[in-house]
A protein has these predicted regions:
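Short regulatory "switch" loops immediately downstream of catalytic or recognition motifs
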Residues: 1, 74
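Bacterial N-terminal signal peptides that target proteins for export
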Residues: 2-15
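Localized chelating/binding microdomains
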Residues: 14, 18-20, 93-94
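Residues at beta-strand starts and edge strands
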Residues: 14, 56-58, 207-209
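N-terminal signal peptide c-region/cleavage motif recognized by signal peptidases
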Residues: 23-26
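N-terminal module-boundary/linker segments of secreted carbohydrate-active enzymes
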Residues: 30-73
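Domain-level detector of nuclease and nuclease-like folds
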Residues: 76-243
């Protein structure tokens, strides 16, 4: 127990140190005119969707969703109103979740001390514009990393705020765009990052859905394994810019 609690303390320290090393001089915004809600945020219940799996943490993945693609066809859905209606701002990449990784598998649904509070969720709704998703990610993934939801969201914000973004509107207009070009553009905008550190998820029609940034246990960038890397560099990829 002492060793595990020591690791929980080091998780936040490692993330802070890594973010200071990785932080760019200027970061392009990914949430345009986003407003954090002023009133209380409803804290939804989180049903478990898989088995408890407690394994040693060997690294992390910061999963980032490309909102224009996610919101295509979801603009009128109540569950996606904040992210997709435009009323709370316009979003580019947003944080899907910060996931601890294990050797050949990943930990999930570790016993959580408590659910997040409204006050813990609200400040993160420009990073992850869904209270339900924030609660889900803490319960499924975060509880396997740290001992309180506030710490999990803090580490996620530190990593998120350390990133610099190339102009994805310009990248999306490139002829014959490939996965390798997307990885290279991100790596060129972020010191210490290399293309092999950047995983991608595309749908069956070739549209970009997510970026998966791979970190070691020390929260420094590391090469993605095959499961997280996604399509080869030569694969054609399209990026939906929205209407």
């Amino acid at each position: 127990m002492g060793h595990e609690s020591g690791h929980l303390r080091l998780t936040v320290r490692f993330a802070v140190a890594a973010a200071l090393a990785l932080a760019p001089n200027v970061a392009a915004a990914q949430a345009y005119q986003c407003r954090v809600p002023q009133g209380p945020v409803s804290v939804p219940a989180v049903p478990r969707d898989g088995p408890v799996r407690q394994v040693p943490v060997t690294g992390y993945t910061l999963a980032l969703t490309w909102s224009p693609e996610y919101c295509r066809g979801r603009e009128g859905r109540a569950a996606d109103r904040r992210q997709c209606s435009g009323r709370a701002g316009r979003f580019g990449f947003v944080v899907h979740g910060l996931w601890p990784e294990g050797r050949g598998t990943w930990p999930q649904w570790c016993p959580a001390a408590r659910a997040p509070t409204s006050r813990e969720l609200a400040p993160n709704l420009c990073m992850t514009p869904s209270a339900a998703l924030l609660a889900h990610e803490w319960t499924k993934h975060g509880a396997c990393m740290v001992d309180a939801p506030g710490k999990y969201f803090k580490v996620s914000r530190i990593l998120w705020n350390s990133l610099r973004w190339p102009d994805f509107d310009r990248i999306a207009r490139a002829d014959n765009l490939t996965a390798g070009q997307i990885r290279t553009a991100f790596a060129e905008a972020n010191r210490h990052w290399e293309p092999e550190h950047v995983g991608l998820v595309v749908n069956e029609r070739g549209w970009l859905k997510e970026m998966r940034l791979c970190y070691g246990r020390d929260f420094m960038p590391t090469a993605c394994d095959r499961r997280r890397f996604g399509p080869p560099d030569s694969a054609p990829v399209k990026i939906w810019r929205g209407l």
